């Protein structure tokens, strides 16, 4: 079910509900989000603060980009030599952008770090796929506060790790900091694979890695599922099927 992916700043995938890879008939918890702030940390506890804004490009130059979000707010970011343009797994140039396209700008309290998830007529495409680590690539835990175009807001707990057990409405992961985190899930829990395709909690397997967005311990979204490492690569025997069905506390 799952596809091997490179974990980049994948929170942005979740924020970009308009992605052409996503099933438009299924709305995830970030559908309609225009702004989000991640208060995150890496496995050593170092803080990572990331902001995402999504909207239509209404002004663009070599030195700045302005988005008009769906809540009618305009946000402007400086563009530097370090600003990266990414779309559908490939890197592009600033000259590949134009006003009228919809994009997500990733920032960290300053200039645009990444411009990505670009949609609309003439959106850049066709370049070779390449790996890329965005600002939140090393984040394994934290919170994401999302603002929606209608003025409402929601907060989500964020964790990233590999599944240790899943079944009977409960799922436990192990993060890179060796901390175990347990969740509950229900029929409304959304699973999206790396390409945005809809999956099912029933298809999740022990050893698979993903990002987990929850509220009050209840999983709302499992994102960018990727395969468990092979026993040969890890030097460890593969978890047994019974482990996946083991109840968790």
For every predicted segment, state its role.
Residues 2-76, 88-182, 194-249:
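Short, flexible, surface-exposed loop segments at domain boundaries
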Residues 80-87, 186-193:
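Structured surface patches comprising rigid loops and adjacent beta-strands/short helices at the edges
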């Amino acid at each position: 079910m799952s596809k091997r992916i490179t974990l980049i700043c994948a929170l942005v995938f979740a924020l970009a509900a308009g992605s052409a890879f996503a099933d438009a008939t299924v709305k995830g918890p970030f559908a309609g989000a225009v702004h989000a702030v991640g208060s995150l940390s890496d496995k050593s506890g170092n803080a990572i603060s990331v902001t995402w804004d999504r909207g239509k490009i209404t002004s663009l130059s070599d030195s700045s980009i302005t988005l008009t979000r769906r809540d009618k707010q305009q946000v402007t970011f400086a563009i530097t030599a370090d600003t990266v343009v990414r779309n559908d797994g490939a890197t592009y140039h600033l000259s590949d952008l134009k006003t009228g396209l919809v994009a997500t700008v990733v920032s960290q309290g300053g200039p645009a770090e990444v411009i990505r998830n670009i949609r609309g007529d003439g959106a850049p495409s066709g370049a070779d796929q390449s790996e890329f680590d965005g600002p939140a690539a090393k984040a394994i835990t934290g919170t994401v506060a999302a603002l929606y175009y209608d003025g409402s807001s929601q907060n989500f707990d964020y964790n990233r790790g590999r599944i240790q057990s899943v079944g009977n409405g409960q799922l436990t992961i192990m993060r890179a900091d060796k901390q175990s985190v347990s969740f509950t899930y229900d029929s409304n829990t959304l699973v999206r694979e790396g390409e945005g395709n809809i999956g099912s909690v029933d298809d999740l397997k022990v050893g698979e890695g993903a990002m987990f967005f929850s509220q009050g311990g209840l999983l709302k979204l499992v994102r960018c599922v990727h395969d468990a490492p092979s026993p040969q690569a890890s030097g460890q025997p593969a978890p047994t099927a019974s482990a996946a069905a083991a109840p968790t506390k």
